[in-house]
């Protein structure tokens, strides 16, 4: 019995020695894995007057021109605000002003997926939200009401910015 007890003790020591042989050795390496996400949204817009908008008589809903908008990066709508824009009866309009800043006529944006907004979120201004994730949009601007216009150059100021839920 003594022999077998010694054999068991030797086997136990071998097993313990094997267990101590497994483990970490050497130094520990440290890696900081930084990542940069370069998601950038850029917005630009251009204006082109409609060739048929010559006056002096203009009809209600006559096309004044087109806002061509490029909106890169992830977004689900584009907001368009107008300097001096207002909402009346649920319809947002923007003034086209003369050289002295006096309103001469009003324009509006309307169409599928376009909602009039009392506050677009752009500097608290009224305008429109175009529900679209497209990169390029061509948004028509039409007259609000009919009028007879004097000769001159009239300007509306639009602010365009992307929106993401």
From Swiss-Prot:
It holds the Pfam family SEF14_adhesin. GO terms for cellular component: pilus. Keywords: Fimbrium, Signal. Residues 1-21 form the signal peptide. It is found in: Fimbrium. The keyword Signal applies. It comes from the Bacteria. The keyword Signal applies. NCBIfam families: PRK15228.1. This is Fimbrial protein. It comes from Salmonella enteritidis. The gene is sefA.
């Amino acid at each position: 019995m003594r022999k077998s007890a010694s054999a068991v003790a030797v086997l136990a020591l071998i097993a313990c020695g094997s267990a101590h042989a497994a483990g970490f050795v050497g130094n520990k390496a440290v890696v900081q894995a930084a990542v940069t996400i370069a998601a950038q949204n850029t917005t630009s817009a251009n204006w082109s007057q409609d060739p048929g908008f010559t006056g002096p008589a203009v009809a209600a809903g006559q096309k004044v021109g087109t806002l061509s908008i490029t909106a890169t990066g992830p977004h689900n709508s584009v907001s368009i605000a107008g300097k001096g824009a207002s909402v009346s009866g649920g319809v947002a309009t923007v003034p086209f002003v003369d050289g002295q800043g006096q309103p001469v006529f009003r324009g509006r944006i309307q169409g599928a997926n376009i909602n009039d907004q009392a506050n677009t979120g752009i500097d608290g201004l009224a305008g429109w939200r175009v529900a679209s994730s497209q990169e390029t949009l061509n948004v028509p601007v039409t007259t609000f009401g009919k009028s007879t216009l004097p000769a001159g150059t009239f300007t509306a100021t639009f602010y365009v910015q992307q929106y993401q839920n």
